[in-house]
Amino acid sequence: MADDLFDFIETEGNFSQLLAAAAAAEEEGIASGPDGGSQGSRRRGSSGEDLLFGPGGLFSDDAAEAEAAVLAAAAGATRPPRPPSAQQQQQPRRGSGEIVVLDDEDEEEDEPGSPAAGSPGRALHQGSEHGHLVLGPRSRAGSGPRPPTPAALAAAEAGAPGGPGRSSPSAASPASSSGSPGPSAAPRRWSPARGDPVGEPGPAARPRTPAPPAQPAAVAAAPARRGPASPASPAAGPVSAPGGGGAPSAGGDRGRHHHQHREPLLDEPAAARRLDPRPLGARSPVSSNPNSNSNSTTTVAVETVARGPEKDEDGLGLAGDGGAPPQRQPRRRRAGEGALRRGRGFSSSSSSGSDSDLSPARSPSAPRAPAAAARRSASSSSSSSSSSSSSSSSSSSEGEEDEGVRPGAPLARAGPPPSPPAPAAAPRPSASSASSSAAASPAPAPEPARPPRRKRRSTNNHLSLMADGPPPTDGPLLTPLGEPWPGSDPPADGRVRYGGAGDSREGLWDEDDVRQAAARYRAAAGPVPVFIPEMGDSRKQHEALVRLIYSGAAGEAMSWLQNPRMQAPDQRFNQFCQRRVHAPHGHGSFITGSVTPPLPHIGDAMAAQDPLWALPHAVSAVAMSRRYDRTQKTFILQSLRRAYADMAYPGRAADPRAGEATVEALCARVRAAFAAAQPGRVPRELADACVLACRGVLERLLPCPLRLPAPARAPAALGPACLEEVTAALLALRDAIPGAGPAERRQAADSVALVARTVAPLVRYSVDGARAREAAWTYAAALFAPANVAAARLAEAAARPGPAEPAPGLPPLWPEQPGLVVPAPAPAAAGAPSGLPGSGPSSPASTKSSSSTKSSSSTKSGLSGSSGYASSPAAGPDPAPERRKKKRRAPGARRPGDGEEDEGLSGAALRGDGHGHRDDEEDRGPRRKRRSLGLGPAPDPAPALLSSSSSSSEDDRLRRPLGPMPEHPAPDGGFRRVPAGETHTPRPSEAALAAYCPPEVARALVDQEVFPELWRPALTFDPAALAHIAARRGAPLRRRAAWMRQIADPEDVRVVVLYDPLPHEELCAEPAEGAPRPAWDPRRGGLSALLAAFAHRLCTPDSHAWAGNWTGRPDIGRLNAQGVLLLSARDLGFAGAVEYLCSRLGAARRRLIVLDTIEDWPADGPAVGDYHVYVRVRLDPAAQCAVRWPGCRELRAAVLDSSSIVGPACFARVEASFARLHPGAEPLRLCRQDNVRYTVSTRAGPRTPVPLPPRAYRQRVLPTVDGCKDMARQRSALGLGDPDFDAGAAFGHRAANRWGLGAPLRPVFVSCGRRGLAELRGPEGLPAELRAFCAAALLEPDAEAAPLVLTPGAVAAAGAPPAVLWDFAPFETSVRAAAGGAVETHRPAGASGAGAGPGEDGDSVEIVGVRGGDGRPRGPLGPIKVEAISDDEEAEDAGNPYLLLR
């Protein structure tokens, strides 16, 4: 603001006169001498400062008087200078009457012990004592009042009219006292920013509050003499004269009223007080020497009182008598003001230096120095020093309140301490002080200081003054002050906008990359992914970005703005911009004017004054933020779209019902077209164009409820003209949907549903043909393919027959791919500019549009797991390059370690293996190192382009086996076969049903040794499985196809169990060393819970049934022998296998039993017809009381059972259905311990199958201790002294020798029913007798025993709880079991007899001890030598010493 004022004065032509007047005033002031001289000489000597800062100066409140002062100064500048006096010649010229402005950077701390340290008020007095004044930086807020002006004191003496609190304008003008004409009316204020006087009453003309009667004139001069403190004149504050009859006195009354009634200007240049109007040669530097003599310059802190909330930060004022203001931190100097604020002052005579009013002209609260206090002799130093001490204490206490400044920090240096005060010395009155004596009154308490404010550092302070209320809603967007935006002017020739407002850089028009990018920008129909100003006018880019934001699904535009898809030319150009544009101009956080590469510089929008152009910048800023998630960003985007809708669609804003009427008219147009249809043969191209138009409308409508109406016409009644009209109406309807109301959107949804149901027979109920006709996506998939197959796919896209030309008047078949109607040849497509297929402008919206139909269905069903046709039922875009994160090996390259069985794949299938991406579960395993494309040179694409042999075509068909469904699919082709009628499970999507693989391709894919021959037809029922086969080989494919080896012949399958394993649970895979282990989930059951239910045992984290403890694959041979097939949702051909079994057995009039345990049904899962038996249950690990209530010891072996969860109840339903369907077959036994065997680590070996039969146990254990004389080794090998059971399985030697190592204890099932299981909240809900029965029951391992199921009301009928009885000795009755770290001893209920040992009193459970660190409590065992143990189980046990080892 100071620079603007300086330029204004200089341009107005008054600055030369001011310099001349200041020089003349300086010479006359020196000639008058320090002793005073005549009154006229003092006035002439002070006119140089009064011209700027005096009561009638240019920066005072009296603008009219300022004009008179200018004229008087110009007239007096021609007088010859008066020679200096003798006294003045003796003093140095430098320290005589000098006023120095001290900048922030020139501050220094006072020396320790200096009296002036931290006392700006003291420094002020010293400066006035020696006849000079130094102005320091202003403070935040001042507490001192504003002293009266000389004119006010003169008016008080003369009794000027106007009543109390008012003064005459003429009396307040120093120009009028010297003969210059003064204003006779209310003074006008001059605004430097506007340049015209403002007709506003000055501070003297405003009403004041009534003041007390005037006091004697002798007291008015007391503050000027700065005498000792007295009760009437306290040293801590100034003395005021509240009733002076004229202008307010130096008290706080005038300052307070002036601050309350004065309206500040918005652009008031308070910073101009730091400017020096003298020539550079006439300025004197600042004296900061602390050891200078009495004639040296003394720095004085100068106060500026804050002017309201819009205070300028460069204001400067003179400290009043009330003490110095609080200190503030030095602020950083702005660019360009260092030379003007380097501590240079205004030279004048000693008397005029105090006489002139240096308070800011626009600071209403700034105190002014009274004339009587300024014009005093040098002998008043003793009295003023005491007053200065009082001011020093006040200023230091107030300075501590400022933030960021340490208490007591000095503002400026002061001279040496003054001499002791001389009370007898009286000040010599001057002419001015004698004539301006006024009455004095007791001084009021000083005003409290304002709280400190945080300093603003904005260089454009006028832009921060926001007006109240919203900006104008029409017209150009201007600043809050109604001005053009700063920095929006066009840059200089040869430069372009870059960086902050007004900044620029050199242009790069001559670069080849820039010229090519400009050509692509001119040819592009949408926004380009990288834009710089050299590419041309940014209006096209801004408008394209706005269209992009309002088109497509929510969030896609934001994603593209943040990370636009770039082709190779755009990527090279982006790298060029990073290297040549951004890198030379700063770091990553440097202000560039745009957030992302597609955005033009924001200065273009500011210059155009178009608020709509700010929308892409706001959306990009939100997209780049990391403080919001995707949903929150979508909300902000929708808010911006709604806020800018009136500007983006001005027609709708003018007429609120314009868009709604358009939607209604278009919907009526659709129905009218069907009503006026004429029969005729409809080309397939027109039907596909109608399908694409329907998709565009649905994309704008989603989410919107849809209904299925009846077709409007039969397919034979539709003609070409009808479809042309319907397609045109749909395309117009798509553009009219944004801004429509809910009712109109529902009407549009009904219309597009009517069109779809009517045209569906023409496209054979599939949209794949329409998607395949979008040749742009064929080119895009080819261009984004890997380098080794990109050329072949590009040639195939060029050879693909394109659609027919649309009829006249019909909209383009690909409305979102402008400029591409007929596929171009391969060379032209390879070098196509950005406006052609796959470029940045069309990528965001089109990617979402064309893949929206298949993304919701085929992606989850597994179609996305391959490349090309394997990822889509048609030739749609290939998502594999976007998701491919790991490198792939080259075609035909062999992975090390795959084994000889990899050779089972045909050569064609091997060549097509490496181009798809793998699922996460397929990439884990021991083989983790793979060859990649980067290890060798890429294959030459030229032979692929030139070759047209059948082998190349067959190779490509094997890589991309899926295509659209033909009119008559071959019976042995690969496609989904869903039975007609009702199904137990959801039907697959239309995209999954439309996928088709030709029979010869399907045979080539499935005829491999990896797949059993009898199960190969099941793979042809699943096109997704064929796509996976085309992209995989080796161990990953073999693991997923291992389910086929459970049952050799599909005819033998009776029951299919569907399950969804937990992560890292594998039924047919060996756990690899170092592979991640599954995590226990008490709320969700997986493979472990299912197998435990079949094995009639508990599944806890420490049991053998938990997959985390497996060291090998489990054995389910007993289940498979009964015709039970376990099929995982992750198995290869999961959906096709179920549908194949349903189809094959249904054709043989046999029903299949399907036991479904999957909680989250996969998308496009198998469809099970209602002809077969379907049982739906769930796996619930919390059904085990040990998991549900871990603290309940008495129910540790109990399991809650219901027909809705996997257990004996649901198994009974399956077994009953099996007995009814197969009456002559052996009954099912689904809950038996021998159904499943686990491979775990035991003392018999790291891979021990459990339960290990007793004979096998003895064969493994006894040879290791036969002949061994080390008793410790024998005890360790045989488990002597260990608990009989650990974690519910046989662990000790005697238990393993009887039931087998790892034989589990059987649980007790408690039947609760569906409702009872949900309502059971705690163990207290079960009867007490049931809990006691479960606590005492100990069911010994039995491979053939059926589950024991109890009901809460039938506990008494169950009899005594079952127990374990040792039959080899009468006193062996207790069983020791370890659970939860404690060893419990279980005794049967009737064990307390004659043979009972000491302490065996019949208690059911007794805790005898806690296992030690080695897991085995020490017992009183004597030395036992094992010589031989017979393995004959039928031998007589009596007298066998080896059975009595306990």
From Swiss-Prot:
Subcellular location: Host nucleus
Gene Ontology process terms (BP): DNA-templated viral transcription; positive regulation of DNA-templated transcription
PTM per Swiss-Prot/TrEMBL: A long stretch of serine residues may be a major site of phosphorylation.
Keywords noted in UniProt: DNA-binding, Early protein, Host nucleus, Phosphoprotein, Transcription, Transcription regulation
Biased composition (Low complexity): 73-94, 166-189, 216-241, 284-306, 345-397, 427-442, 827-877, 933-952
Pro residues bias: start-end ranges: 415-426, 803-815
Sequence ranges of Basic and acidic residues compositional bias: 262-277
GO cellular component, one term: host cell nucleus
Regions of compositional bias (Basic residues) in chain numbering: 883-892
TM stretches of this protein: none
Region named Disordered: 25-59, 73-493, 801-987, 1385-1446
GO MF, any single term: DNA binding
Biased composition (Acidic residues): 101-112
Function according to Swiss-Prot or TrEMBL: This IE protein is a multifunctional protein capable of migrating to the nucleus, binding to DNA, trans-activating other viral genes, and autoregulating its own synthesis.
Protein family according to the UniProt entry: Belongs to the herpesviridae ICP4 family.
Protein's name according to its UniProt entry: Major viral transcription factor ICP4 homolog
Organism: Suid herpesvirus 1 (strain Kaplan)
